[in-house]
Amino acid sequence: MDGFSRRRMLMTGGALGAVGALGAATRALARPLWTWSPSASVAGTGVGVDPEYVWDEEADPVLAAVIDRGEVPAVNALLKQWTRNDQALPGGLPGDLREFMEHARRMPSWADKAALDRGAQFSKTKGIYVGALYGLGSGLMSTAIPRESRAVYYSKGGADMKDRIAKTARLGYDIGDLDAYLPHGSMIVTAVKTRMVHAAVRHLLPQSPAWSQTSGGQKIPISQADIMVTWHSLATFVMRKMKQWGVRVNTADAEAYLHVWQVSAHMLGVSDEYIPATWDAANAQSKQVLDPILAHTPEGEALTEVLLGIVAELDAGLTRPLIGAFSRYTLGGEVGDMIGLAKQPVLERLIATAWPLLVAFREGLIPLPAVPAVLWTLEEALRKFVLLFLSEGRRIAIDIPDVNRPS
């Protein structure tokens, strides 16, 4: 499958040949056959090509050229000036990069401002749940996604995981920000920069022997399937868990929250034919692309330890066992084992019993419950975590890499 790109596939095999090639590749990589229909997408139609073999034909050649020309340091310096959606691009950018960025910053025609506003308000209103699930649910689940763990670990960002996690948190904050897609917001900027980072990693990581030896046969990282795996570990997982916890979510708020993530996927370069149009479609796609691929890797376990170490800095490690137990409760014991979360049987049983009561109280469904004091300690620790990583004042520079992780 060397050099297997969407363009080459369509040129050399035709539809029937492509299906055969994709089926063989799926078996080799132990991936389920791609059967999700584009009729369930925001586009409503599509050619149905497996996103495993679709990358970013707009961004990838441009960023490869920028890297090969040695322009990354100068470009990063210029891009530090670009922080708001309504800002003009900085002067001095290479022409091909400027052209790409001007195109990439355009919102999709189907974006609904009212839905985006409502979705952002929902994220703010449910901030304690959304923030905790992003960080201690989705963030830790990402370490059980082998490709994501290895792409992070062996890329330049893997050398400074605290900075890498902060940048990931920045994306989560910007998506949920009340001003995310407004002129004075910054989500368009964050999305375009992240899309360029992904393109740079696709160019660089295949040059890493360490990544190539552990990639499971993948020749180019961060396919559109990989992006949607991450998307589901965030959007679909968070909505599913909130409903399981008994958080009150009405239909309009759920649809608005989904719309925020639909627009964000588009802005990150995902083809509209892979973006679910409804939560039912999202759950169906998640069961196909996310659930079967969760697994243990040494890289993922190492990243879990780094993340929990950062959380421990909040209070010198006093609540680390509690946070670990909450994460196991949130992710489930199977995923907890995959990523090396220590078992905390007593705390896990306590949280499983009392956390739903605490949620019901916060949602105004029951009076103040009689829960162990440790649960209030947990809630306070979660609030500190959310404030630390989703703080508006935390300005993070998203830089394009020009090297892999140093060996």
Curated annotation (Swiss-Prot):
Function: Involved in the initial step of rubber degradation. Catalyzes the oxidative C-C cleavage of poly(cis-1,4-isoprene) in synthetic as well as in natural rubber by the addition of oxygen (O2) to the double bonds, leading to a mixture of oligonucleotide-isoprenoids with terminal keto and aldehyde groups (endo-type cleavage). The cleavage products are of different lengths, ranging from C20 (four isoprene units) to higher oligo-isoprenoids. Is not able to cleave low-molecular-weight substrate analogs with isoprenoid structure such as squalene (1,4-trans-isoprenoid), carotenoids, or alpha-tocopherol.
Phenotype when changing T168A: 2% of wild-type catalytic activity. Still contains a heme group
Listed EC numbers: 1.13.-.-
Organism of origin: Streptomyces sp. (strain K30)
Thermal dependence of function as given in the entry: Shows a 3-fold higher specific activity at 37 degrees Celsius than at 25 degrees Celsius. Has a melting temperature of 61.5 degrees Celsius.
PROSITE patterns found in the cross-reference section: TAT
Chief subcellular location: secreted
CC per GO annotation: extracellular region
Record: residues binding heme: H198
Outcome following mutation: R7A: Does not impair clear zone and aldehyde formation
Cofactor(s) of this protein: heme b
Effect annotated for changing H198A: Loss of catalytic activity. Loss of heme binding
Observed phenotype of the null mutant: Cells lacking this gene exhibit reduced growth in medium containing poly(cis-1,4-isoprene) as the sole carbon and energy source. Additionally, they show no detectable Lcp activity on latex overlay agar plates, being unable to form a clear zone and to produce aldehydes. Complementation with the wild-type lcp gene restores the wild-type phenotype.
Reported induction: Weakly transcribed during growth on glucose. Strongly induced by poly(cis-1,4-isoprene).
Protein name: Rubber oxygenase
Membership in a protein family: Belongs to the rubber oxygenase Lcp family.
Signal sequence extent: 1-30
Effect of M1A: Impairs clear zone and aldehyde formation
Record annotation: effect of changing R164A: Loss of catalytic activity. Still contains a heme group
pH dependence statement: Optimum pH is 6-8.
InterPro entries, per database record: Lcp-like, MPAB/Lcp_cat_dom, TAT_signal
GO terms for biological process, alphabetical: isoprenoid catabolic process
Organism superkingdom: Bacteria
PTM entry text: Exported by the Tat system. The position of the signal peptide cleavage has not been experimentally proven.
